[in-house]
Amino acid sequence: LNVKREEAAKMIANAFGFKNAKQELSFKDCDKNDWYYDFVSALTENGIITGQSEDRFGVGENITRQDLAVILYRTAEKQGYQFENEKDDFTDFERIGDYAKEAVKSLAGAKIISGMEDGSFAPMESATRAQTAKMVYELMKIINAEV
């Protein structure tokens, strides 16, 4: 099963304690009564997640592996984690969006993310629940969050 953008927001907000956001969202696809509103708002307020455009979050859409990497990278930085190693030997590294390359290199170097069996990263593929849970867990371990 793939993870929707709003589901990823909930997983990360809960895992790392982002809550009580005061920021109102400008996304037309996020209503205050939606179950995910507070999670998206908390991550937006902390500079961790952005919409697909200024007025659209992308509710109901699968999160890509590269977008998840960016969100986890920003989460780590917000938690004060300093990345020391980088790894960019994925066979499809050139297919990773420029905005996500630093995140992918850093998370791979920290062993938070790994590639597919064929050595690729598959940046535009949807992140599965298993992949997302493993990445969140690995990040929690390295920043000494409660697991």
Regions found by a protein language model. Give the residues of each.
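Feature responds to low-complexity, polar/acidic, surface-exposed segments characteristic
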Residues: L1-E6, I12-F39, E45-K101, S114-A127, ...
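Catalytic cores of secreted/periplasmic or lumenal enzymes
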Residues: V104
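Short intrinsically disordered, low-complexity segments
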Residues: Q131-Y137
